[in-house]
Amino acid sequence: MQYDCSGSWLNAKRQRINCHKEQGHGTQTLVQAFANSCNPYFAQLVQSEQLPLSRVIETFTKMGYAVNGEKGKRLLMDGITASPATVTLADPKDFDTQWGCLGQGDTLISPYQLMLWQTAVASGTGKSVQPYVIAAKTDAEGNRTEQTVRQSSEQLFSATTAQAVRDVMTQNAAAYYKDSLGDYVCGVKSGTAQIIDHGEEYENSLLVGFSMQETCPVAFCILIEKRTAGELTTASLAKVLLDALQDMT
């Protein structure tokens, strides 16, 4: 599926979706648009008949979203609970729905849930790995007792989808994050949220991903609020995190 990005796009209701690249990305495939974080591409995809909104809602619900006010399933980790992601998807031709499908607008989600999805992608199974806080206990005599058993979730999306997304994310990391992440074999996706708060405009910078290193198989989610261009990046923080975890092994 190909769509054109000229830097800005008007939907069926004459509402404008802007791209972060003012001159546009030109004609793109889905994989290219994913790597480019191209808003107009995905807005056109949502509006098209190639991707029915009912299918989007079904997929989002399986992934754990509470869609259109429905009560979602709370997330658990060793007795700790977190609220599920929420989003409103009402009209595929409307800005709010198109923006919501892009993770913008009134979409809310926790870093915890984003990392669960990353484990489902990294494993190539479409099932997330259940995390835990304490792996084992060691008593005063040095006897170690394991506290956990590896558990997986129900199917969030197909293994085929998981493997395809994993390939795209690892290609994205290799192409654009080699200088930041060094020799780590990772899959990553960045995101930027434009915020207007009491007249103040700023950006929140996000990076989600996973490491494929056998010695450091982790998922991560890094957020810098009110980030200033030229300062610390989410990718550089990811490198510090992975280095620290590697040193622990």
Regions found by a protein language model. Name each.
Residues N143-S152, A235-T249:
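Short, gly/Ser/Thr-rich active-site loops of penicillin-recognizing serine hydrolases
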